[in-house]
Curated annotation (Swiss-Prot):
Residue ranges, annotated region (Disordered): 26-90
Membership in a protein family: Belongs to the V-ATPase G subunit family.
Membrane disposition: Peripheral membrane protein
Biased composition (Polar residues): 56-69, 78-89
InterPro entries with a match to the protein in the record: V-ATPase_G (IPR005124)
Protein name in UniProt: V-type proton ATPase subunit G 2
Biased composition (Basic and acidic residues): 35-55
Source organism: Sus scrofa (Pig)
GO biological process: synaptic vesicle lumen acidification
Keyword terms, alphabetized: Cytoplasmic vesicle, Hydrogen ion transport, Ion transport, Membrane, Transport
An example Gene Ontology molecular-function term: ATP hydrolysis activity
Annotated gene: ATP6V1G2
GO cellular component: clathrin-coated vesicle membrane; melanosome; synaptic vesicle membrane; vacuolar proton-transporting V-type ATPase, V1 domain
Main function: Subunit of the V1 complex of vacuolar(H+)-ATPase (V-ATPase), a multisubunit enzyme composed of a peripheral complex (V1) that hydrolyzes ATP and a membrane integral complex (V0) that translocates protons. V-ATPase is responsible for acidifying and maintaining the pH of intracellular compartments and in some cell types, is targeted to the plasma membrane, where it is responsible for acidifying the extracellular environment.
Amino acid sequence: MASQSQGIQQLLQAEKRAAEKVADARKRKARRLKQAKEEAQMEVEQYRREREQEFQSKQQAAMGSQGNLSAEVEQATRRQVQGMQSSQQRNRERVLAQLLGMVCDVRPQVHPNYRIAA
């Protein structure tokens, strides 16, 4: 009986060691999965930062040329507005005189299609 009891004890100890090994293996697997997940997350973040930086540089290049274009357009617009204002100042008196002349000098005329009924 003692040998059976000793055999059972050995089996229980072996089962306990096996359970511990399985638990350790599961813990190692969980740690490896967690580490792999963290590494993948870091790679994703690094890739995202690289793409964002690339996008920002391309956007700056595009906006820089567009900024120069808008400055040129604004300058041309200012020149045109100044030209129109100076033209208005030069021709103001002449246009007012012409307008007043047309309003005040009324010349009554009979319309060419009017027929005098006899």
